[in-house]
Amino acid sequence: MNSAASTHLLQLPQAPCPKPAKTAQPVKASPLLKVAPVPAPLAAKAAKEKKRKKTIETIIRRFTTYATINSQSWDAYDPTEFPISDGQEDMAELIEQELRTIGSDKDLIVSRSEYQYVYATIPANCEGVPSIMFMAHMDCTPECAGGEITPIVHRNYDGGDIQLPAGITLSPETPQGKHLANCVGKTIITSDGYTLLGADDKTGCTILVTLIETILNDKKLKHGDLHFVFSQNEDIGRAADRFEEEYLDGQPDIVIDVDGDDPTAFSVENFTAVGRNYIFHGKNAHPGNGFYNQYGDALTAASYFIGQLPPETHPSASKGKEGYIHCYSVSPLVDVDADDTQQEYLVKVRLRYFDPLEGKAFRQLLDRAAELTAEAFPYVVTEAEPEVMQYENVAYTMYPGLDDLIVEAAEKEGVKLTPRSERGGTTAAMLAAKGQKGGPCLYSGQQAEHSVYEWTCAEDMYQMVMVARSIIETVANQ
């Protein structure tokens, strides 16, 4: 091809060469995110709180089950009798069965006596540690309406008045509800207002059964022999009447009752309590011929006897460590409508005092009242029955230094407790009157006891379980 015949070809621009593909690099796996471990103190705190809540729920279930049983005690005139109601027996059977479920025969020895006392012992797991006996009572007072008891659980209490189905109000502004101000956000348990609740002393029973369960699940806790007594007829002053020491293998070193009503204090001394009965034997006659027929008006004579006692010795005039004389019952011993001739009236009298000299003065006043009555009513025979020691001051026989030990143990649980004098009696005080060792009384959670306003706080009961556990630990470490 010669150059003359050649044609010019259109030169198209060339597309840029594609960049060579980069060699694929292996993708590195992202390291797994490491979750920081929960600090040990926080984990322990969370576990402790979970356990606390679980125990409180157990306490609520346990107490409300106990409360539905009407275990009111009832008194008998004959001091040799020891009446037990069906409800008291049901209560004893329930606690016995529950304890046998909680522990084995090896680590918890359980017995129920023919008088419906329940005894339990956790054997010592170390040597040289004082033994402790904790006590509560299963019966409730006959001095308030009982029958069908309906406990009501009020969760997350808001601090206001609690309206009960019976139409009554439990208020923090009243004496019965003053402790409610300290229970905001907690669980309150009341009755329906028609009956008592039985917090005195089923709260104590709840605390002790829960304490037993707590101890058996805590293998690190060192302790001496631990005894638990669930008694009967405390509310009629006879809890010691059928107490059987042989169930405990001798006297314990330390005695502690769980039957108090003050969350800030525990009793270290109490009244000496004496019961006296006076019988006025008279005879009926037509009042129109009363002089000639030697009318023996036993009822008026009994009233006259009561009237001879100075008003300043009445309970309404007594406070602090002052004692009192209380003529609390006047009742016929015969059917006055069925018997045309005989009249007999019984006057029951309580003597309460801290000072033995005051007790002696009270006895002299009663003796003088009986003498004056015999002079004023010559046709009525005034008979003074032998007095009965109902309970004794626990301060006389309490374990030395126990008050300081309890204060120390409570402080470890963040609870401030103050020793106080008790204007009443406890199971420990009744045992002291029978020659047993006396001991203090701890708060059990009961409030407004012996009334239809009676109530308790579940968290209070839990707190006292932990205080009791701390007492056991402190005793072992002293």
PLM regions with names:
Residues 300-320, 324-326, 391-441:
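Active-site-adjacent substrate-binding region
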Residues 77-129, 133-135, 139, 412, ...:
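A non-catalytic alpha/beta surface segment that caps or lines the substrate-entry region
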Residues 128-221, 225, 230, 463:
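Active-site metal-coordination/substrate-binding segment of hydrolases
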Residues 343, 416-470, 475:
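Zn-dependent metallopeptidase/amidohydrolase metal-coordination segment
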Residues 181-271, 317-339, 347-354, 476-478:
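Acidic/histidine-rich catalytic neighborhood of metal-dependent amide-processing enzymes
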Residues 53-86, 189-190, 389, 447-451:
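N-terminal capping segment at the start of a domain
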Residues 80-83, 325-335, 347-354, 381-403, ...:
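A short beta-alpha structural unit
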Residues 268, 290-336, 340, 357-383:
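Acidic-enriched catalytic cores of C-N bond-cleaving enzymes acting on peptides and small amides
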